[in-house]
Swiss-Prot record:
This is Phosphoribosyl-AMP cyclohydrolase. It is found in: Cytoplasm. Its main location: cytoplasm. GO terms for cellular component: cytoplasm. Catalyzes the hydrolysis of the adenine ring of phosphoribosyl-AMP. One of its GO terms (biological process) is L-histidine biosynthetic process. Binds 1 Mg(2+) ion per subunit. Keywords: Amino-acid biosynthesis, Cytoplasm, Histidine biosynthesis, Hydrolase, Magnesium, Metal-binding, Zinc. GO terms for molecular function: magnesium ion binding; phosphoribosyl-AMP cyclohydrolase activity; zinc ion binding. InterPro entries: PRA-CH, PRib_AMP_CycHydrolase_dom, PRib_AMP_CycHydrolase_sf.
Length: 116
């Protein structure tokens, strides 16, 4: 017996406003301090995987593939909550970050180049 692959809950999918290439920006924040860690991109499947496993899963625009944060680096994100903004076009993913969130190894992607 072969069923169709799991899909994102239709009620959630209907509320998402995606970019033309089917993506939604995800702001990632440390759940207990409010520190903004990074911005990543999700499509319906990345969001479904994140909600199902509580392991932060994103779509890599440069590599054209899914990636689970920390799968190779060990710098994991355990998802505590996911919220949709009032317009339905941005996700807020609150996580418990282990290690650095940035690909450079820094704690956050927003601490290297302060403009003001």
């Amino acid at each position: 017996m072969s069923g169709s692959p799991p899909q994102l809950d239709p009620e959630i999918a209907a509320r998402l406003k995606r970019t033309p290439d089917g993506l939604v920006p995800a702001i990632v924040q440390q759940y207990d301090t409010g520190e903004v860690l990074m911005l990543a991109w999700m499509d319906d499947e990345a969001l479904r995987r994140t909600l199902t496993t509580r392991a932060a899963t994103y779509w890599s625009r440069s590599r054209g593939e899914y990636w689970v944060k920390g799968a190779t680096s060990g710098n994991t994100q355990r998802v505590v909550s996911v919220s949709l903004d009032c317009d339905g076009d941005t996700l807020l993913v609150k996580v418990d970050q282990t290690g650095g969130a940035c690909h450079t190894g820094d704690r956050t992607c927003f601490d290297a180049d302060r403009l003001l």
